Amino acid sequence: RAVIGMDGKQSEVGESNGRSGKSLVGELMRNIIPTAYIPGKRSDLFNDQFVWNDIQENTKLVFIDDVLQNFNFEFLFPNITGDWSVNYKGGRRITLPFARSPKMYIATNHAIRGSGSSYTDRQWLLAFSDFYNDTHKPVDDFGVLFFSEWDFEQWNLTWNLLANCVQLYLTYGVVQAPGERLEQRKLRQEMGETLISWADEYFSGEEHLNVRLPRKDLYDAFCQYDN
C-alpha cells in the first residue's frame, strides 16, 4: 500500500493548509534510506515516460511530494501491487519485481480522489493536525532546522525512535490511523462548497427537518441557490 499524508483539518475545497509536517516525514526518509524524490505539483506528471528515472535497483522509497487536487492515484495501482517498470533516459529499461520494488509515500494538502476497495486496499492514510502551521514551525520548538542542523544527539534520538517504530511494527503489525476526519474531508471535496453552503442554509429551518422532501423540490431549490 501507499502511505498518504494528508491534512486532518477541515477546510474549504481547494484551500491548501500545508506546513503541518507531511513533507517532513518524507524528508526524514530521504535522510535514512535510498529515496527517489518526485515533485507532485506537475499537472502532466504521469504523461512523462521518464517519471521514474531516479528509481534505482536499491531504492527503498518513492516520495511524491505535494500532489495536486486532481492527482490520478489510479495510475499508481500497478506499482503498488505489482512489479515496477522503469524507463531510463538513454533507452535502458528495468523491471523491479514486487518483492524488491520500493514503497511509496505521498504528501498532499487535498483528499485523494477515488472510492471503493481498489483504492482503500492500496492506501494507508495518515491525518496530520495543524499543531504545526504557517505561524508555528518545528524550529520554534526545537531551535534548529531539522536534519541539516542536527547534532549527534539529535540523530541518536532519531535512530532510537525508528528502532522503537520497527519494534512496534513487529509486535502489532500495521495499525491503521483513525480516518474519520479524512473521510469527512474527502466527502467535502466531492460535494463541493456550493452544495454544502446550500444544504447548511436549506436545512437550518425546522420545516425541512425530519420530513419527507420530494427530490425534485430539493433539486430546484439548489439550482435557484446556485444561480
Stretches found by the model and what they are:
Residues 1-227:
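Feature primarily recognizes SF3-like P-loop helicase cores of small DNA viruses
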